[in-house]
C-alpha cells in the first residue's frame, strides 16, 4: 500500500470545551482509530491539505493554493509552535509538476501553519506535529473569493498524479469542516479594524490573539447552551458530503458552490475543500475504499465533526 488517506475535522476547542462524557469518549475513540490506521500504514510522507484561520495567510496576498517549501506552526490555541520537517526538494518538484499540469499554485519558503493543519498531526503523534516528514499544502477555505470546487478537485488530482508512481508510502491528510459557522469576520461586513486585521494581521500585538481565542471559546459555550447567534450545524448536509466521499465519485464534489455552502452549512464549511483535495488526490492513484467513518454534530466544538480513513481498493 503506497497511498492512503485520513480526513478529519479539527477544532481549537478540543482542549477548551467540555462536551458530554459520551461525546468526548466517542471522539477519543475516533482519534484512536485514526492513530491505529496511520501507525499501520506508517507513512514516509504526509501531504497535509490544510486551511488557515487568518494566522498565516491574509488578504494582503491570498492564494487559492500554496505549497510550503519550509513551514512552522504558529502556536495558536496552544498548538504546535516550531519548525516542521518539510522535504524541500519534494515540495519544489511537486509545485512544478502541478503547474505543468494546469493548476496554478503559489509557493512559500516560510509558510506559517496554524491549528487547522497541525492539530491532526498532534493527535496522531502524541502532540508532536513534527514527528513525520510533512508537505504542507494550503487550501484557501475561509477567505472569498473561492475557486470553483472543480478547481479544488483538479488541484488535488494533480497532487495525486505526482505521487501515483512513487514507491514511498504517502498519506493524504485533509483537515477541517464539516458544517460550522464560528465567529470569523467576513470582509464584506467587517468593521474597519477587522478589515485591517484580515488584510495585514500577521504580527498582532501580544494581547490580540488571546482575545480572539477567548471570543471563540465564549461563543462555543453560548452555542452549546443555545444562546449564540451563529448558524446551527447541519447534519443532513454533512452526511450528504460524506456520502460523496464514500462513493468514490469525486466529480460529484463539483456541484458544491460557495453561496450554497454558506447558506446551508456556514461560512467555515469551505474547509471541506481540504477533504475534496485529499480525496481527489487518492482517487488519482486509483479506486479507493473508505475503511472507517465517524460523524457527530458537536456544538461544544462548533463543528459537524467527522473522521474518515481510506485506502486503495484491493489493498486491505
Swiss-Prot record:
Q: Does the keyword Iron apply?
A: yes
Q: Does the keyword Oxidoreductase apply?
A: yes
A molecular function annotated in GO for this UniProt entry is: ferrous iron binding
Write out the catalytic residues in the record: 115, 180
Catalytic activity annotated for this protein?
3-(2,3-dihydroxyphenyl)propanoate + O2 = (2Z,4E)-2-hydroxy-6-oxonona-2,4-dienedioate + H(+); (2E)-3-(2,3-dihydroxyphenyl)prop-2-enoate + O2 = (2Z,4E,7E)-2-hydroxy-6-oxonona-2,4,7-trienedioate + H(+)
Set out the biological process GO terms recorded for this chain's protein.
Answer: 3-phenylpropionate catabolic process
Q: What does this protein do?
A: Catalyzes the non-heme iron(II)-dependent oxidative cleavage of 2,3-dihydroxyphenylpropionic acid and 2,3-dihydroxicinnamic acid into 2-hydroxy-6-ketononadienedioate and 2-hydroxy-6-ketononatrienedioate, respectively.
Assembly description: Homotetramer.
Annotated NCBIfam families: PRK13370.1-4
As for family, the record states: Belongs to the LigB/MhpB extradiol dioxygenase family.
Q: What is this protein called?
A: 2,3-dihydroxyphenylpropionate/2,3-dihydroxicinnamic acid 1,2-dioxygenase
Which organism encodes this protein?
Rhodococcus rhodochrous
- What is this protein's gene name? mhpB
Amino acid at each position: 500500500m503506497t497511498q492512503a488517506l485520513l480526513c478529519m475535522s479539527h477544532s481549537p476547542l478540543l482542549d477548551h470545551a467540555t462536551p458530554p462524557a459520551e461525546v468526548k469518549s466517542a471522539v477519543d475513540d475516533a482519534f484512536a482509530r485514526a492513530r491505529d490506521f496511520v501507525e499501520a500504514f506508517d507513512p514516509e510522507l504526509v501531504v497535509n491539505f490544510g486551511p488557515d484561520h487568518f494566522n498565516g495567510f491574509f488578504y494582503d496576498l491570498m492564494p487559492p493554493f500554496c505549497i510550503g517549501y519550509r513551514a512552522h506552526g504558529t502556536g495558536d490555541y496552544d498548538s504546535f509552535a516550531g519548525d516542521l520537517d518539510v522535504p524541500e526538494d519534494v515540495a519544489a518538484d511537486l509545485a512544478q509538476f502541478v503547474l505543468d499540469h494546469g493548476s496554478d499554485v503559489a509557493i512559500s519558503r516560510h509558510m506559517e501553519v496554524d491549528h487547522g493543519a497541525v492539530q491532526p498531526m498532534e493527535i496522531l503523534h502524541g502532540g508532536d506535529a513534527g514527528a513525520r516528514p510533512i508537505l504542507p499544502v494550503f487550501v484557501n477555505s475561509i477567505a472569498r473569493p473561492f475557486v470553483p470546487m472543480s478547481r479544488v478537485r483538479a488541484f488535488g488530482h494533480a497532487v495525486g498524479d505526482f505521487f501515483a508512481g512513487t514507491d514511498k508510502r504517502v498519506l493524504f491528510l485533509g483537515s477541517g469542516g464539516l458544517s460550522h459557522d464560528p465567529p470569523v469576520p467576513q470582509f464584506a461586513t467587517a468593521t474597519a479594524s477587522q478589515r485591517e486585521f484580515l488584510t495585514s494581521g500577521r504580527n498582532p500585538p501580544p494581547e490580540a490573539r488571546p482575545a480572539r481565542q477567548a471570543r471563540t471559546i465564549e461563543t462555543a459555550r453560548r452555542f452549546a447552551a443555545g444562546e449564540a447567534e451563529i448558524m446551527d450545524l447541519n447534519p443532513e448536509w454533512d452526511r450528504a458530503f460524506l456520502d460523496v466521499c464514500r462513493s468514490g465519485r469525486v466529480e460529484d464534489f463539483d456541484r458544491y458552490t460557495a453561496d450554497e455552502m454558506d447558506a446551508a452549512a456556514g461560512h467555515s464549511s469551505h474547509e471541506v475543500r481540504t477533504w475534496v483535495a485529499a480525496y481527489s488526490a487518492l482517487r488519482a492513484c486509483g479506486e479507493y475504499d473508505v475503511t472507517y467513518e465517524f460523524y457527530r454534530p458537536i456544538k461544544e466544538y462548533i463543528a459537524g465533526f467527522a473522521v474518515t480513513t481510506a485506502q486503495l481498493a484491493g489493498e486491505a
